């Protein structure tokens, strides 16, 4: 099952040229760019592992692409995403996030419904590999 999280998730995978163009768009607006990776794509897993430090002073997308290549080499079977942060108001806000690397075989999410007290429904999600 294809995981759909972030911008462009319903489109085919972006090429490196398209990724570079999106990073250039982010940098042109003064947003800081960072890379994160995970092997657990569960929607509630919002805290992925950071790859390096956020690139606050970067002006050229080549720096991000070099870091992305290194991250892909280190974690070829993981999800990798690019985040862009806007800190113009004194606090960091994610303005853009998109997946740039996926494992060859993506896991599926299974949802189980359980009726509990008072006819309430409890939902449990698990990953099926």
Swiss-Prot record:
SMART domains: RuBisCO_small. Pfam families: RuBisCO_small. Induction: Expression of this form I ribulose-bisphosphate carboxylase operon predominates when carbon dioxide is limiting. Keywords: Calvin cycle, Carbon dioxide fixation, Photosynthesis. The keyword Metal-binding does not apply. InterPro entries: RuBisCO_ssu, RuBisCO_ssu_dom, RuBisCO_ssu_sf. GO terms for molecular function: ribulose-bisphosphate carboxylase activity. GO terms for biological process: reductive pentose-phosphate cycle. Belongs to the RuBisCO small chain family. The basic functional RuBisCO is composed of a large chain homodimer in a 'head-to-tail' conformation. In form I RuBisCO this homodimer is arranged in a barrel-like tetramer with the small subunits forming a tetrameric 'cap' on each end of the 'barrel'. Heterohexadecamer of 8 large and 8 small subunits. HAMAP family: RuBisCO_S_bact. RuBisCO catalyzes two reactions: the carboxylation of D-ribulose 1,5-bisphosphate, the primary event in carbon dioxide fixation, as well as the oxidative fragmentation of the pentose substrate. Both reactions occur simultaneously and in competition at the same active site. Although the small subunit is not catalytic it is essential for maximal activity. This is Ribulose bisphosphate carboxylase small subunit.
């Amino acid at each position: 099952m294809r995981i759909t999280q972030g911008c462009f998730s319903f489109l085919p995978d972006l090429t490196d040229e398209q990724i570079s163009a999106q990073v250039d768009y982010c940098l042109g607006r003064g947003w800081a760019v960072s890379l994160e990776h995970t092997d657990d794509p569960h929607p509630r897993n919002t805290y992925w592992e950071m790859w390096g430090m956020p690139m606050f002073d970067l002006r050229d997308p080549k720096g991000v692409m070099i870091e992305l290549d290194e991250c892909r080499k280190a974690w070829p079977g993981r999800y990798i995403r690019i985040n862009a942060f806007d800190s113009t108001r004194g606090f960091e806000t994610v303005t853009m996030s998109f997946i740039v690397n996926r494992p060859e075989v993506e896991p599926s999410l299974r949802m189980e419904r359980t009726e509990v007290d008072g006819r309430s429904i409890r939902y449990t999600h698990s990953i099926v590999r």
